[in-house]
Amino acid sequence: MTLPGLLQNNGIETVNSMKFSILAALVCALVSPLAGAQNYPSKPIRWIVPSTPGDGSDAMGRMIADRLSREIGQTVFIENKPGAGGVLGSEFTAKSAPDGYTMIVGNAGSHGVNAGIYTKLNYDVVKDFVPVALICTTPNVMVVNPSVKVKTMAEFLAYAKANPGKLNYASGGVGSSAHMSAELFKSMAGIDMAHIPYKGSAPAVNALMADESQVMVGNLPPWSALIKSGKVQALAVTTPKRHHSLPDVPAMAETLPGFDTLAWFGILAPAGTPKAVVTRINALVNQALEHPDVKAKLATLSCDPAPSTPEAFATRVTADVARWKKIASERNIRAD
């Protein structure tokens, strides 16, 4: 073969080799995530709870994690990272590898309210997370210590207006959904109460029971048994209509038309988590929510199972962020 012919053939072979290499790289890029998702999970999965043991996110996370562990052949374990109203656990999750092995049990406070009250977050509540699965929704409930001698919302409002500054209300931290719900209530009712923030909802509940504070607007689950036992007085749930678990407790909107704050709990992952992984965990959580044991447990906690798609959950998160940003701005509430 002549030299020009040899060079020509080598050139063709080189071009073909380059084409093959590029094609192989593209195939690998497409196949690798799918292969990883098919093998997922190949090790234990960590769910971060951005609050103390015993609060709503902790209870929901442990219940669903236990059910998933039985289904997938790997342990889904809870790791509590409380602090700054959910900021510490959220930041940790946002900066974790988006491989499906670290997710967060978020809520309306950590992934709704915080975007409005923190101006210096090291993560974006919307952009740095992908909503995976909504677990349940529940109203907040306004309760008072028995030392406050009232039985109805009308009696409470009359007492609060006659005794300005004498009532303290507890919350699980500045910017928690309990804090924001109470501030919205104060604004709409035209009353004055001092805020005492605690490091998590469990200490806040204990504080109200000890009469360190007299009032709390908190997620319904920790209060259900205490309300039904008569240890605290429930004045209203924070949804437009009464909740089926407490039919005798009025809706806040019956006294303050338009009042509506719904709490939610759900699983979110770091942005960039493979869609196949998100889809699988979503399906597993939705499946768990249909299990009789889970339904029964949610009923005892006064929570309504809320199976959903990742897209619908994302819409809820985005709407919550916009709403609480507006309320935080109007009430000049800042946590930093």
Predicted regions and their residues:
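N-terminal (or domain-start) structured segment
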Residues: 37-127, 166-168, 174, 190-215, ...
